[in-house]
Design a protein with these regions (language model features):
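A generic structural signal for alpha->beta connector loops
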Residues: 25-27, 58, 100
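Charged, low-complexity, helix/coiled-coil-prone segments
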Residues: 31-40, 56-57, 61, 106, ...
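NAD(P)+-binding Rossmann beta1-loop-alpha1 motif at the extreme N-terminus of oxidoreductases
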Residues: 1-50
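Rossmann-like NAD(P)(H) cofactor-binding subdomain of soluble oxidoreductases
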Residues: 62-110
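Short, functional N-terminal and low-complexity linear motifs
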Residues: 5-10, 58, 80-84
Length: 110
């Protein structure tokens, strides 16, 4: 069974992690608070350029307010928000992580 993965915060770090995990076949849900960004990801996927080249991958992206209605439980949740959003985002994400799930802090110190 494939692990269910959530990424809270889809800026530079969250986008990079989410795009690579999705490309490798993992079931990833991206959660972000910026509606236009969510719309763009839904319409265009994520485009990544790194030292190994470029790729675009379609992603499952949802807005924070839509995530509040989710019943899904995740095995792994990445916290990829700015430091000033850590507390509320961690509390928000907690209800979606399985009891034996893991939260990975992947903040970039901004």
């Amino acid at each position: 069974m494939t692990k269910q993965i959530a990424i809270m915060g889809v800026g530079a770090a969250g986008s990079y992690i989410g795009a690579h995990l999705t490309r490798e076949g993992y079931d990833v849900t991206l959660i972000d608070m910026w509606g236009k960004h969510v719309d763009a990801m839904q319409d265009n996927g994520l485009h990544v350029t790194d030292a190994l080249g470029e790729f675009t991958v379609p992603v499952k992206a949802i807005h924070l307010t839509d995530a509040m209605q989710m019943n899904q439980q995740f095995d792994i949740a990445f916290l990829a928000v700015k430091s000033y959003d850590t507390e509320w985002a961690a509390h928000f994400l907690k209800r979606f992580v399985k009891k034996d799930g893991v939260v990975v802090d992947s903040q970039n110190c901004m």
